[in-house]
Amino acid sequence: SLMTQIQRAYQRAHPPLKKQLVATTTKNKRLRVGFAGAYWKRHSVCKLLCGIVRGLASLDDFEVVLFDATEESDDWLAWTLGTGATHRPMDMTLSSRTQVQDVDILVYAELGMRARALTWAHARLAPVQVLFWGHPHTSGLPDSIDYFVSSDGFEAPNDDLSRRYAEQAVRF
């Protein structure tokens, strides 16, 4: 796809982008889920995802970390964190594995609207990496993004999603 070609061109121009870090997780009884993005505030991306983040954080089986590409906050961020999610800044260096807190799953709220999240997405920072529909198009990064979460409301019933997504598309 065109997005895959664009992302590979970025990787050729900036080889450190395609960093494959060894994903090590603690054998914890709680599944650690990280959410990376820039719109954990009053924004359409937060309206699509913040309720899900809040719901997961309220469950005993999950530990939730929000990685934030901005330093902006408002009442929506406070509401999202209200059930126990942890809030961390996104580090651009990608050099420290501890930045991602050894999450089991890393979910990108959107890609393509802020450089910081897109830079992270080029690297394998967690055993499973997912792109959510905050900006509903493929990442073009099949080597580092495993799944694209779509919706029956976004896709035609019998559409072959593998033609449009570099990732494995999953209907939510």
Go through each PLM region and give its residues:
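Alpha-helical solenoid repeat scaffolds of the TPR/TPR-like class and their adjacent stem/linker regions
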Residues: 1-171
